[in-house]
């Protein structure tokens, strides 16, 4: 199967800058704004958007990471007792406007798990969703507030997001 580059490094940079502007417009600035990246690639995208917001607004927005592994219902994991230690949200989100940032929005199950983890942990003022790629095929009634690129795909296609921090390059590829 051949691969198709959907976003190269320059296009990804422009897309993340646009998403940063959209998030700022949505929130009317940076007041009470917290970016929460879903491990693994979402956390690096959140840091990139944080950097772009800092360029635009000349202020730093708190950015954290959420590991939702124990909240997934689509992985073959034993059903452990969920405790505060079974997921990580490393920034205070109480009464904040939280933007969950993920690399690919597909079935919606990662977002559902993120919401479960967040609401068990805290009570944000508002929660929004940003996805670099929305590929469709939802299994849950979930939609992103901020989308970098809508990419209609077949279910058997793979959408891969590469980030410099883990993959050595920034790109979005369909395989």
Swiss-Prot record:
It is an enzyme of class 2 (transferase). Keywords: Glycosyltransferase, RNA-binding, Transcription, Transcription regulation, Transcription termination, Transferase. It catalyses: UMP + diphosphate = 5-phospho-alpha-D-ribose 1-diphosphate + uracil. A motif (PRPP-binding) lies at residues 98-110. GO terms for biological process: DNA-templated transcription termination. Gene3D superfamilies: 3.40.50.2020. Pfam families: Pribosyltran (PF00156). GO terms for molecular function: RNA binding; uracil phosphoribosyltransferase activity. Its EC number is 2.4.2.9. Homodimer and homohexamer; in equilibrium. Regulates transcriptional attenuation of the pyrimidine nucleotide (pyr) operon by binding in a uridine-dependent manner to specific sites on pyr mRNA. This disrupts an antiterminator hairpin in the RNA and favors formation of a downstream transcription terminator, leading to a reduced expression of downstream genes. Also displays a weak uracil phosphoribosyltransferase activity which is not physiologically significant. PANTHER family: BIFUNCTIONAL PROTEIN PYRR. This is Bifunctional protein PyrR. It comes from Staphylococcus carnosus (strain TM300).
